[in-house]
Amino acid sequence: MNRRKSREVAMKLLFEMSINKEEFSEILKNFKENTDTNMENVDFIYINKIVNGIEQNKEDIDKKIEENLTKWKLNRLSKIDLTILRISTYEIMFMEDIPNKVAVNEAIELAKKYSADNSPAFVNGVLGNMIKA
């Protein structure tokens, strides 16, 4: 199974949930029906763990992100950056089998691929503050 690809799918699903306010099961069903993403080697157990973990711990995760923002508020972040930060923060806080540096690096890679030009440095700064604390 490919964790990077699974993280990317989880990010797409969480982003979609933040926009459409639909249940995860409905978003997942629509995603599988309409995606052009190759779903081979995607770990749906891992995706479920991330999505459900973030949904169950969103308040704590968002608090942790906000504590590590410099001169920013959570509500000013783009939805994609917030989604990426939530995934990596969840991994840092709750998934001991993932080294913090891996969670940070994966977040930077997602930001490079899906967000604005300045987002990788921003994501790195927020998460860097978090793992130093």
Curated annotation (Swiss-Prot):
GO terms for biological process: DNA-templated transcription termination; transcription antitermination. InterPro entries: NusB-like_sf, NusB_fam, NusB_RsmB_TIM44. Keywords: RNA-binding, Transcription, Transcription antitermination, Transcription regulation. The keyword Transcription applies. One of its GO terms (cellular component) is cytosol. GO terms for molecular function: RNA binding. It holds the Pfam family NusB. The keyword RNA-binding applies. Belongs to the NusB family. Involved in transcription antitermination. Required for transcription of ribosomal RNA (rRNA) genes. Binds specifically to the boxA antiterminator sequence of the ribosomal RNA (rrn) operons. HAMAP family: NusB. This is Transcription antitermination protein NusB. It comes from Clostridium novyi (strain NT). The gene is nusB.
